[in-house]
């Protein structure tokens, strides 16, 4: 399997090169050159999660040995998740919740980011590299801590995380600011997630930044890195095989997946699963009040020229959705000229409109719904009080979308909703939605939520209160590139 840039399909690299580089030099995203291979579902039924991960990753990592992939998967997933189950399913009235938050930082990003450091290290071995790898990562809350957890004190790596000063939950902020690891830096930016993400993209090709890291590699742990995306394909297959084995569906039956979406990486992994032969009828894109994706999927027009709305589901507070570029590249049969036109229009004018042909291709696999703040809170309330299932605001947005889709389409196909974070990461908003009460202290709220629901607090969150805060730096977004360059210079000096 080779990888090509969405902005120059003649730029062909190996999987190791794609993972190390993160972003192509032309600003494009590395995408599989072909998706002709299929996963044998009958064989998949006989596999546990680790075996399934090895099977699927082997299709994409052709320059990795079988032993390398096996070792990466075992190092990532053995003993890292509660009860050694990466993605358990929970039945609820409209279908199933795929609980992706039982990892070390209580968010779905753990599934990919426990594995990415091992993939990156193996890729380095394959390329006979021994320079320092500096990881730049923008986060809307969950990616940051999951990436830090994965890369902390990993040999020959350093990680720098940028997060918006306002817009992440108190618990998410505390998770990042108390992080351990001698190779870690965490910086708050006076801006939103789109600003942070743009800074990372600009840094990857900025001459001053690149000059500061002449003797190291610059990469990213965001979903712009294909190594972040590939591990997420696995849990789509895993959930399907679980339903077949439980007798809830027959092998070959179609299912729908409902995915809370911001940067579009998680739902794109579902589309890649479909291309590999998973019987997916619809991928339902769930958005909050920042409904640029809903509008795009329904109309074919992408318009980022709108007010940025901070919500109680901050990981979806995004106006520029990076992985959409990969999807359009795939749907347009690798039309890099078209992708360049769209991305230039987005950068210069803040909007673009795809052709009717491309919109029809998009709507064959995708549909979309958005959710207001009040609707989100009501779903949190109803899901707990009617079914005693505690969900976070992002999952609530997806549960709302699942119900709306069923109501509008009358589709009886089984639905699997991706539950992406522990409710305790957003304790203040969840507690307020359930009780109508507010509490200023995040830990008091966490304990109050536990007292109210009797749902266990994840250990990694319960211990946060006693951990010292290490990182307090806050910068203007205009100073970000200079700050990154200085960080890289210091890393280079220390490494030498």
Cite the ranges covered by each PLM segment.
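PLP-dependent amino-acid enzyme catalytic core
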Residues: 1-496
């Amino acid at each position: 399997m080779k990888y090509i840039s969405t902005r120059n399909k003649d730029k062909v690299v190996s999987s190791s090169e794609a993972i190390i580089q993160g972003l192509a030099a032309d600003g494009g995203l590395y995408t599989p050159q072909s998706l002709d291979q299929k996963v044998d579902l009958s064989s998949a039924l006989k596999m546990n999660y680790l075996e399934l991960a090895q099977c699927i990753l082997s299709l994409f990592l052709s320059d990795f040995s079988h032993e390398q992939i096996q070792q990466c998967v075992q190092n990532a997933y053995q003993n890292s998740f509660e009860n050694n189950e990466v993605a358990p399913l929970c039945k609820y009235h409209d279908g199933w919740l795929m609980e992706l938050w039982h990892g070390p930082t209580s968010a779905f990003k753990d599934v990919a980011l426990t594995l990415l450091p091992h993939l990156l290290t193996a890729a380095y071995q394959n390329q006979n590299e021994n320079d320092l790898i500096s990881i730049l990562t923008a986060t809307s809350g969950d990616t940051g801590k999951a990436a830090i957890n994965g890369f902390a004190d990993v040999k020959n790596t350093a990680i720098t995380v940028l997060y918006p000063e306002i817009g992440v939950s108190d618990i998410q902020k505390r998770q990042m600011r108390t992080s351990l690891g001698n190779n870690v830096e965490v910086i708050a930016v006076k801006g939103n997630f789109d600003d942070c993400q743009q800074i990372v993209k600009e840094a990857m090709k900025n001459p001053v930044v690149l000059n500061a890291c002449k003797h190291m590699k610059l990469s990213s742990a965001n979903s712009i890195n294909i190594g972040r995306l590939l591990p997420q394909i696995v849990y789509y297959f895993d959930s399907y095989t679980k339903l077949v084995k439980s007798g809830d569906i027959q092998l070959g039956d179609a299912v729908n997946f409902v995915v809370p979406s911001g940067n579009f990486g998680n739902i794109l992994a579902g589309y890649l699963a479909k291309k590999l032969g998973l019987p997916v009828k619809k991928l339902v894109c769930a958005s909050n009040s920042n409904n640029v994706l809903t509008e795009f999927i329904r109309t074919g027009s992408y318009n980022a020229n709108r007010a940025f709305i901070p919500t109680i589901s901050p990981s979806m507070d995004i106006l520029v959705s990076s992985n959409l570029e990969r999807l359009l590249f795939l749907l347009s049969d690798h039309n890099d000229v078209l992708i360049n036109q769209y991305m230039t229009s987005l950068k210069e004018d803040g909007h673009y409109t795809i052709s009717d042909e491309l919109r029809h291709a998009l709507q064959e696999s995708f549909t979309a719904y958005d959710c207001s703040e009040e609707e989100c809170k009501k779903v949190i309330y109803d899901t707990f009080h009617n079914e005693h299932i505690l969900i976070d605001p992002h999952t609530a947005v997806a549960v709302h979308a699942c119900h709306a889709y069923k109501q509008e389409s009358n589709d009886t196909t089984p639905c699997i909703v991706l539950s992406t974070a522990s409710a305790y990461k957003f304790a203040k908003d969840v507690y307020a939605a359930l009780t109508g009460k507010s509490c200023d202290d995040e830990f008091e709220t966490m304990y109050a939520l536990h007292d109210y629901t009797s749902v266990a607090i994840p250990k990694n969150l319960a211990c946060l209160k006693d951990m010292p805060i290490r990182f307090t730096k806050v910068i203007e977004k205009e100073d970000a590139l200079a700050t990154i360059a200085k960080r890289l210079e210091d890393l280079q000096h220390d490494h030498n």
